[in-house]
């Protein structure tokens, strides 16, 4: 197994008596895409800021590349895209990229060459001489992403990278992140968009109210939460199946969409028994399939109770953004 690039060891951070991150431990192996997932205010940005040494933990330890200490000491090996985007609005796109690369120690000629290559790659080549404030929000976001990559970092940290992107640019970002992994980079990104996380993540950690709910390989998490879900399609009305759905010894939960239904089985229920009952009821089936739960469903099942408890709490993380 790859050695961890990032380790949080029982890290806690408090603001004004509120615990934003509560004893969080996680490890990000080298060469993977790791998702830090949670609802708004869960502690994702606070955790990333502790990794980057923007703020210090009140308790616990941050280790990067096997060394104790946070991102300031390893800044040359890290590319960081913060949630709050910030570029010099009156500078021209190419000039601002070259300037930011030079700040990271990249020689001017190399910075210009890399910036032009990245601009062409992300469809912004024709905009290189335009001022930043002439670009759309999505374009500016891509420019800021480029600025995180020009010094060729080993670890790329992206805080809500898909926020505000249209579907086309979100796909461009997804393809770029996948290519970074193929090149051996380690990517840590935070998001509350489960569809993107499911497509990208090798490993993930779900947090809520600053606490870890689950972490590990995506495949293992799905396996742990799977095996008790059915998708049933009907040729015609599902009315005949309603009595079967109501049997609490077989079915724990039903999402009935009319022409098909998603079932969560009771703990000791047998899918074959449900199939037999449905056939006996006269229901005409077009589909009967055991399925893995989506990451979105796992997220809702895990985070839902925590989110309900957090609803009345102030968003302290946002207040310290």
PLM regions: where:
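C-terminal coupling/interaction segments
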Residues: 266-321
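Short, surface-exposed acidic/glycine-rich loop or hinge patches that mediate macromolecular interfaces
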Residues: 68-69, 212, 235, 268-269, ...
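ABC transporter nucleotide-binding domain
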Residues: 174-266
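ABC transporter nucleotide-binding domains
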Residues: 3-6, 13-209, 213-214
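Non-catalytic alpha-helical coupling and interface elements of nucleotide-dependent molecular machines
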Residues: 102-105, 250, 304-308
């Amino acid at each position: 197994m790859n050695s961890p690039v990032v380790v949080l060891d029982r890290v806690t951070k408090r603001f004004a008596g509120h615990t934003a991150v509560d004893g969080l431990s996680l490890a990000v192996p080298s060469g993977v895409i790791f998702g830090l997932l949670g609802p708004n205010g869960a502690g994702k940005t606070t955790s990333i800021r502790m990794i980057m040494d923007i703020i210090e933990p009140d308790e616990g330890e941050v280790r990067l590349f096997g060394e104790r200490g946070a991102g300031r000491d390893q800044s040359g090996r890290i590319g960081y895209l913060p949630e709050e985007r910030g570029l010099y609005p009156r500078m021209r796109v190419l000039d601002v990229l070259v300037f930011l690369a030079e700040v990271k120690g990249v020689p001017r000629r190399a910075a210009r060459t890399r910036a032009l290559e990245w601009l062409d790659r992300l469809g912004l080549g024709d905009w290189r001489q335009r001022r930043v404030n002439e670009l759309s929000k999505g374009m500016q976001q891509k420019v800021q992403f480029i600025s995180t990559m020009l010094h060729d970092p080993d670890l790329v940290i992206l805080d809500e990278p898909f926020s505000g992107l249209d579907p086309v640019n979100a796909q461009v970002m997804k393809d770029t992140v996948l290519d970074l992994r193929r090149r051996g980079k380690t990517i840590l990104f935070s998001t509350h968009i489960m569809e993107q996380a499911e497509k990208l993540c090798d490993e993930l950690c779900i947090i809520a109210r600053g606490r870890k709910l689950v972490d590990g390989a995506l495949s293992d998490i799905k396996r742990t939460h799977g095996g008790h879900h059915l998708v049933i399609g009907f040729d015609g009305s599902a009315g005949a199946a309603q009595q079967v759905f109501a049997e609490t010894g077989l079915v724990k939960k039903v999402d009935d969409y009319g022409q098909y239904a998603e079932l969560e089985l009771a703990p000791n229920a047998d899918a074959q028994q449900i199939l037999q009952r449905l056939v006996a009821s006269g229901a005409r089936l077009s589909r009967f399939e055991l399925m893995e739960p989506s990451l979105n469903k796992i997220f809702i099942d895990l985070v839902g109770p925590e989110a309900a408890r957090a609803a009345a709490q102030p968003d302290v993380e946002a207040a310290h953004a």
